[in-house]
Regions:
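Long, hydrophobic N-terminal alpha-helical segment
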Residues: 1-50
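Short, surface-exposed amphipathic charged segments that create phosphate/polyanion-binding patches used
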Residues: 21-23, 71-76, 150-157
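Short acidic, S/G/P-rich loop/turn micro-motifs used as interaction or catalytic elements
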Residues: 12-13, 40-41, 80-83, 94-98, ...
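Short, solvent-exposed amphipathic alpha-helical segments in soluble enzyme
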Residues: 21-24, 48-52, 105-106, 122-126
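Glycine-rich, aromatic-bearing surface loops/beta-hairpins
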Residues: 104-159
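Helix-adjacent hinge/juxtasegments
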Residues: 48-91
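ASCE RecA-like P-loop NTPase motor cores
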Residues: 2-4, 25-31, 40, 86, ...
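Acidic beta-strand-to-loop metal/phosphate-binding motif
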Residues: 35, 88-90, 105-109
Length: 159
């Protein structure tokens, strides 16, 4: 079963939200593939992962780096899983063809953009019609934290 979590961003940009979610994933020893919109987004995310944590950095690689299989976080624009990740973070507004191969899919969207919200609703409806799926709608709180607002299926803990 794949758990799909829709992260409704209200007060944080994608580039700022990703490092916080990645810290949680790495703390649980999970590997992550981040599916980005384009190369420019990958560069911005990579910069954030290098600088988001004052005590260090979040180890990661991109399509341009050697040995993607070694990377705990792999940033890409392609639907691939070279690091054998169990978590897929989708930032490009798509429904990946092989999403069910992951234990968890995190779909982040800009809650301040009506088109982004409408597209997220369409993706939610699509996933809800799929077998063996648990859905969670996770709303960003004013302080930047997260709260699960709605669940469908058998959910796992929020990332």
């Amino acid at each position: 079963m794949t758990t799909i979590q829709f992260y409704h961003l209200r007060s944080t940009s994608l580039e700022r939200a990703v490092p916080k979610l990645m810290e949680k994933a790495l703390a649980s020893k999970a590997r992550v593939v981040v599916l980005a919109r384009d190369a420019a987004m990958i560069r911005r995310l990579s910069d954030q992962l290098w600088s988001a944590n004052p005590q260090g950095f979040l180890p990661h690689g991109t399509q341009e780096d050697p040995h993607p299989e070694w990377q705990p976080i792999y940033l890409t624009t392609a639907q691939e899983n070279p690091n054998q990740a169990t978590i897929l973070m989708v930032l490009n507004g798509t429904i990946p063809a092989e999403f069910s191969r992951y234990e968890k899919l995190l779909d982040l969207f800009d809650g301040n953009d009506e088109d982004s919200v409408a597209a997220a609703r369409e993706r939610y409806r699509h996933y809800r019609s799929q077998p063996d799926i648990a859905l969670q709608y996770v709303l960003q709180q004013p302080g930047g934290g997260w709260k699960i607002e709605q669940e469908f299926g058998t959910p796992s803990a929020a990332a």
